[in-house]
């Protein structure tokens, strides 16, 4: 049975929503949850009928958001450190944390370790599209300065994720650029373009709008650009939501129309809701590491755990290592 280490203290709202999400996941899937944090606090939120499916790991410290990422190596009593150590030791196959993302990445890379041939592990996230599908965007923040070789590797890892986790047999892969034409981009992306052409599913440059139109399954970029794209899209979605609500309230006719459109709004919200997938995997490290938002709801935590279970039951890491080895020898 898969064992998942859960950093119960890392989120912005304490352990309650994280444990609630864990219990919701236990209701639907078979796995053992290792809850890491203050046991006295955590026990309050675990129903008696689930006690046998949960293991408590005592942690006496919460790693603060104000800390530098690599400082976590000195905080061995922190919940995130202990959660990652459960994966490193082999007791758990996956870790889910809504805590300090930089600390989670540092621990995953330095303590769990990278897969063979992986230079830089990227964070991958699923972006909504107008077709109802998802575009995998990576890197969205792990590596702000990248070489062409790193971006090429992101393409290999993204393709593996699309095939093994998303179930897409022949995923279309693009590189984020300032135009679709082959000659567009900066020196790094142009060089990465040449390397990516070795992949049979590479289709070329992708403009920012193509993240959301469903024309590509995987889009790669460095973590600086990717994080800006991610945060910009979140900002636009939030602004549009506020604008629609503001305009609807101005007119009784608009309110009536909104009531009639309630089902449509619900579908749109579901397609664009972060809670539906719950977290972003850090690819290229041994085992599975899922990074969730600090403000994650119980639903987001539940779906992050589902991601971890699907990842742990797949062959994705073997595929990544084998594909990178193949390209290395070409």
From Swiss-Prot:
Q: Does the keyword Transferase apply?
A: yes
Which EC main class describes this enzyme?
transferase
Q: Which GO terms describe its biological process?
A: fatty acid biosynthetic process; phospholipid biosynthetic process
Q: What family is this?
A: Belongs to the PlsX family.
Signal sequence residues = none
What quaternary arrangement does the UniProt entry report? Homodimer. Probably interacts with PlsY.
Q: What functional role does this protein have? A: Catalyzes the reversible formation of acyl-phosphate (acyl-PO(4)) from acyl-[acyl-carrier-protein] (acyl-ACP). This enzyme utilizes acyl-ACP as fatty acyl donor, but not acyl-CoA.
Q: What is its main location?
A: cytoplasm
Q: What is the name of this protein?
A: Phosphate acyltransferase
Q: Does the keyword field hold Transmembrane helix? A: no
Q: Care to name a GO molecular-function term for this sequence?
A: phosphate:acyl-[acyl carrier protein] acyltransferase activity
Instruction: Please tell me one Gene Ontology term that the record gives under cellular component.
Output: cytoplasm
Q: Which reaction does it catalyse?
A: a fatty acyl-[ACP] + phosphate = an acyl phosphate + holo-[ACP]
Q: Which organism is it from?
A: Campylobacter hominis (strain ATCC BAA-381 / DSM 21671 / CCUG 45161 / LMG 19568 / NCTC 13146 / CH001A)
């Amino acid at each position: 049975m898969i064992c998942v280490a859960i950093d119960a203290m890392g989120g912005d709202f304490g352990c309650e929503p994280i444990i609630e999400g864990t219990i919701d996941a236990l209701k639907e899937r078979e796995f053992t949850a290792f809850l890491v944090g203050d046991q006295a606090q955590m026990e309050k939120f675990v129903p008696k009928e689930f006690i046998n499916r949960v293991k408590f790991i005592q942690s006496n410290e919460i790693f603060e958001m104000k800390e530098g990422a690599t400082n976590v190596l000195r905080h061995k009593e922190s919940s995130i450190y202990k959660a990652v150590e459960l994966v490193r030791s082999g007791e758990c196959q996956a870790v889910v944390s809504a805590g300090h993302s930089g600390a989670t990445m540092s621990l995953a890379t330095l303590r769990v370790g990278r897969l063979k041939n992986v230079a830089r592990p990227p964070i991958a996230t699923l972006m909504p599209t107008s077709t109802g599908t998802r575009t995998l965007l990576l890197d969205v923040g792990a590596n702000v300065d990248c070489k062409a070789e790193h971006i090429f590797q992101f393409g290999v890892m993204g393709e593996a994720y699309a095939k093994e986790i998303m179930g897409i047999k022949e995923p279309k892969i693009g590189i984020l650029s300032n135009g679709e034409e082959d000659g567009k981009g900066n020196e790094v992306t142009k060089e990465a373009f040449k390397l990516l052409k070795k992949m049979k599913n590479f289709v070329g440059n992708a403009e920012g709008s193509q993240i959301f139109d469903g024309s590509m399954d995987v889009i790669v970029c460095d973590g600086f650009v990717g994080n800006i794209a991610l945060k910009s899209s979140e900002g636009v979605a939030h602004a549009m939501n506020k604008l629609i609500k503001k305009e609807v309230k101005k007119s009784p006719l608009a309110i009536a129309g909104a009531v009639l459109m309630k089902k449509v709004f619900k579908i749109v919200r579901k397609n664009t809701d972060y809670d539906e997938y719950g977290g972003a995997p850090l690819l290229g490290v041994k085992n599975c590491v899922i990074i969730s938002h600090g403000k994650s709801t119980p639903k987001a935590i539940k779906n992050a755990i589902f991601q971890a279970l699907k990842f742990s039951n797949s062959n994705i890491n073997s595929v990544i290592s084998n594909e990178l080895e193949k390209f290395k020898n070409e």
